[in-house]
């Protein structure tokens, strides 16, 4: 098995720490860190300044990053909009559709969504009177049939996560979108790929998604930069979320005219260093290849599931064999307390519902522990986790607190 840890300086600085929280944010390879440092130490110019060969370099990196993102998901260059992250991307899309929605229109979501794919649509419900419909039934993981049952003449938008934030479920966006559009071709579909694009390939042309969102920091890139993919014909119809320099081609005392392409969504100076880091992360991932990444993750996660299944006190939730996330609880111990105990053993996990607060309608718990694996995890990480769980004694969760 490849030692991917060697590419991540975090492990050199934290030799005794096990990192199992990649669903929250990924660690960064040295090439990403170097690219960001290069920007600040060698360039540090604004990408909108193209008046010299020196400043043009940063403009080229911005364009190269956009081109690589487009290649990454098989989109067109001018369908990629840079944002601060998936949260802003979802807000941008919901707000952009505001003029085209009215009272009584229906937006379909699921119980497994992150708050970022709930609140922007809830805001439209509060402001416009649109109706929110949840596809899946309580106590059930969403299935294709759930989406198809709730499609109606009033359905305008379907927005769902292709990978669950908490329980690591995987939805087949190709199958779901294909069948939704068979019933209602004009419905707009948004895929939140934030928790899955770091693990598998996406093809927006194949799946025919109208929108897709994700964040760079989940796939080895820097924080503060993300992507909203929007189909070209929709970009022209949507209003911007924010207004500022660079998005208009004319302005006077009484009027202004915006570009009718992706530029109208990118007012102001962007996260320039983020372009450098994100571009390096994309190249790093493409050099390794998703087949190797997925194969590596499956081996590690299967081993972890098999080992956890041997511990009577452990309960796991909605296990998807293709997911790199495992959600569990320890019988009789509050999840945050047990996560604190693991933390005292230098094992980083996440407790709670991880911003997917309404998921308790599916898994019937108010608190769980999430261990999420990525390319830099190995069997030793799993062994350390299992050893710590087996060594737990009642009261150990209070270590370091009292």
From Swiss-Prot:
Modified-residue entries (N6-(pyridoxal phosphate)lysine), positions: 218
Keyword Electron transport belongs to the record: no
Keyword field: Pyridoxal phosphate, Transferase
Catalyzed chemical reaction(s): (sulfur carrier)-H + L-cysteine = (sulfur carrier)-SH + L-alanine
Molecular function (Gene Ontology), one example: cysteine desulfurase activity
Gene3D superfamilies recorded: Aspartate Aminotransferase, domain 1 (3.90.1150.10), Type I PLP-dependent aspartate aminotransferase-like (Major domain) (3.40.640.10)
Cofactor(s) listed in the protein's UniProt record: pyridoxal 5'-phosphate
Enzyme Commission designation: 2.8.1.7
General function of this protein: Catalyzes the removal of elemental sulfur and selenium atoms from L-cysteine, L-cystine, L-selenocysteine, and L-selenocystine to produce L-alanine.
Entry's family note: Belongs to the class-V pyridoxal-phosphate-dependent aminotransferase family. Csd subfamily.
Protein name as catalogued: Probable cysteine desulfurase
